Amino acid sequence: MSHRDTLFSAPIASLGDWTFDERVAEVFPDMIQRSVPGYSNIISMIGMLAERFVQPNTQVYDLGCSLGAATLSVRRNISHPGCRIIAIDNSPAMVERCRRHIDAYKAPTPVEVIEGDIRDVAIENASLVILNFTIQFLEPGDRQAILNKVYQGLNPGGALVLSEKFSFEDAHVGELLFNMHHDFKRANGYSELEISQKRSMLENVMLTDSVETHKARLRQAGFEHAELWFQCFNFGSLVAVKSGEQA
């Protein structure tokens, strides 16, 4: 059961850095819907992308799965024999709740939920890999290596979905979209105190990149085809396809 996010509604004397702990996991569905513009669209359309890219007898990876929203969207939209979804997150609280969510919805495609570091997970025989608002929480020096590993583990014709909060090389545009995002949160009931305190906790943990930086990394990893397919304010998603024919 999801609860309304009121974690930052009262002043917090010592904020510290952001962690995906039990308190965050409990309110996460409400938090992300009210904080990330276009989130529901991205989740539903990941299912549509899965219909197009997932192949029989292959694996789907949801790297940084949180509560499993993307995994569930994929599973609702595929019915190929021999497919398996592997969902990974390093937060024990998220993994525990993710397993409950997955178990609550019965479907023929098996899902394995793993508590672990995505940097340590092997990607093999993949037709679809999802990095949904995950890269931004990794150390910048680790980001290229993850994308390299994803590319190597994808089968020809397979796809990566990479969703992120973006920074912008044009400072004027960046400020406009930053302010519109805050307007979005205000419209969803967050107070100035809540917005400010959450931002303070995230600023040393969530380090954003520009769309151009993401595309450059994808090219370096080997992807010949990569483009932004969805954007709302300073949030969006790219799809990158590995060249070659699907088996």
Curated annotation (Swiss-Prot):
InterPro entries associated with the record: CmoA, Methyltransf_25, SAM-dependent_MTases_sf
GO MF entries: carboxyl- or carbamoyltransferase activity; S-adenosyl-L-methionine binding
One Gene Ontology term from the biological process aspect of the record: tRNA wobble uridine modification
Nucleotide-binding as UniProt keyword: no
One Pfam family linked to the record: Methyltransf_25
Positions contributing to S-adenosyl-L-methionine binding: Y39, G64, C65, S66, D89, N90, D117, I118, N132, R199
UniProt-listed NCBIfam families: carboxy-S-adenosyl-L-methionine synthase CmoA, PRK15451.1
Name of this protein: Carboxy-S-adenosyl-L-methionine synthase
Source species: Klebsiella pneumoniae (strain 342)
